[in-house]
A protein has these predicted regions:
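Sequence-specific dsDNA recognition surfaces
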Residues: 4-22, 27-58, 81, 197-213, ...
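Non-catalytic DNA-recognition/assembly elements of restriction-modification systems
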Residues: 1-17, 130-207, 330, 334-379
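A short beta-sheet element
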Residues: 33-35, 47-107, 224-225, 241-304, ...
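A short glycine-rich beta-alpha junction/loop motif
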Residues: 79-86, 117-145, 277-283, 313-338
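ATP/adenylate-binding site constellation spanning eukaryotic-like Ser/Thr protein kinases
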Residues: 125, 170, 225, 321, ...
Length: 384
């Protein structure tokens, strides 16, 4: 392998800094901020015409360098990238773009271990440019990146399958319970009218405090909002943090299969657990319910924007339990609910199976990544 200074084999371009009054609610170009980099949080727009190097487009290599860190091969069309994101342009005669992407994935923890800044941890452009990188031959780089991309492409395909299945389930929910397509366009008189709290018991999780005294490297899973926002599937099957058993006295332990709803940070987000976990007071759960988890999941997805509007405006940090308990709704007859569940449950079962496959593929990729980067796995004889 040959050793290089990162800035000598890859150009690092700064994005554009914006004043708040320049961020529009609609416009010609979306502005890619760090908040949109790892999720689909609220977007801002601009009508400004900028130099071409202030835009990124599909298959551009980007790196978020402030607050949240990491690389991405962009696939969201032409956007303006914010100042806290770099566009990286490799020298194609020396470095393969996709190999650099995986090198950055592998190296991000090391790269950011020495970050500095009084308000937000960040890297500087000089920090990145002065990194040392060892590169095999260009041919070998392309072999390594091809192996990893094959796995990532399968993961992406599975995510698209899941999104399609969920869209089908949401369309069925809308047809049955919003448009009443099977009931002449209106809710039947036989459906019980009331508020959500009449049909579902809503409770809040709990947090042992100070939480730092209970966090551990092993023990009981500790579900955070970030575990939910980092996955598009309805199901959560990976949780990063743990607490010790003493924390059980002041929290709520839920078994796999339970439905939870976020009520802080990113409120109104429903998820179904595929793993046992404790939940803090930023989560709501449903101890008893006359409605299935699948029905409730789709119900919460449908009313999420309305719940936000009932909070402190368009953006709020907490979803009050009373707002949810007093939300007007109805209880369809058992026959209708059984018919609906018989259609959507198989869709959710397929989503769950695919979500588990995604986890296995992710584990495989993350296991191969350091071995391929270090050369521990010799792929020189592979024909890829």
């Amino acid at each position: 392998m040959a050793k290089y200074r990162f800035g000598d084999i890859c150009e690092v371009l700064n994005g554009r800094a914006y004043k708040q009054n320049e961020l529009l609610s609609s416009g010609k170009y979306p502005i890619l901020r760090v908040g949109n980099f790892f999720s689909s949080d609220r977007w801002y727009y601009s009508d400004m015409e900028l130099p071409e190097n202030k835009y990124c487009d599909n298959e551009d290599l980007l790196f978020a360098w402030s607050a949240s860190f990491g690389p991405k091969i962009w696939d969201g069309g032409k956007v303006i990238y914010h100042y806290h994101i770099w566009k990286l342009i490799p020298n194609k005669e020396i470095a393969d773009k996709f190999y650099l992407y995986y090198w950055l994935c592998h190296s991000v923890n090391r790269l950011t271990a020495g970050t500095h800044g009084s308000v937000m941890a960040h890297m500087t452009k000089g920090d990145m440019e002065n990194q040392q990188i060892e590169l095999p031959s260009l041919q070998m780089q392309k072999k390594v990146s091809s192996i990893l991309r094959t796995i990532d492409e399968k993961i992406e395909l599975n995510n698209k399958i899941n999104n399609n299945l969920e869209e089908q389930a949401l369309a069925l929910f809308k047809s049955y319970f919003i448009d009443y397509d099977n009931f002449n366009g209106q809710a039947p008189d036989t459906w019980e009218k009331g508020v959500l709290g009449d049909f579902v018991e809503i409770k809040r999780g709990g947090s042992p405090r100070p939480i730092q005294n209970y966090l551990s490297d092993s023990g009981l899973h500790w579900l955070k909002i970030s575990d939910a926002t980092c996955i598009t599937s309805p199901f959560i099957n990976e949780i990063k943090e743990y607490i010790i058993e003493d924390g059980l006295k002041k929290t709520v332990f839920l078994k796999a299969g339970a439905l939870v709803l976020s009520n802080s940070a990113t409120p109104g987000l429903p998820k179904i657990l595929d793993i046992d976990t404790c939940i803090h007071d930023g989560w709501l759960y449903f101890s008893t319910s006359r409605l299935s988890n699948e029905y409730l999941y789709l119900f919460f997805k449908h009313i999420r924007e309305k719940l936000v509007a009932l909070g402190n405006g368009s953006v709020f940090t907490n979803l009050k339990t009373d707002i949810l308990k007093n939300y007007p709704t109805f209880l369809p007859t058992n026959e209708v609910l059984s018919e609906f569940d018989s259609i959507v449950k198989p869709l959710f079962e397929m989503i769950l199976a695919t979500t588990r496959e995604i986890k296995n593929l992710t584990t495989l990729r993350d296991t191969l990544l350091p071995k391929l980067m270090s050369g521990e796995l010799d792929v020189s004889e592979l024909d890829v």
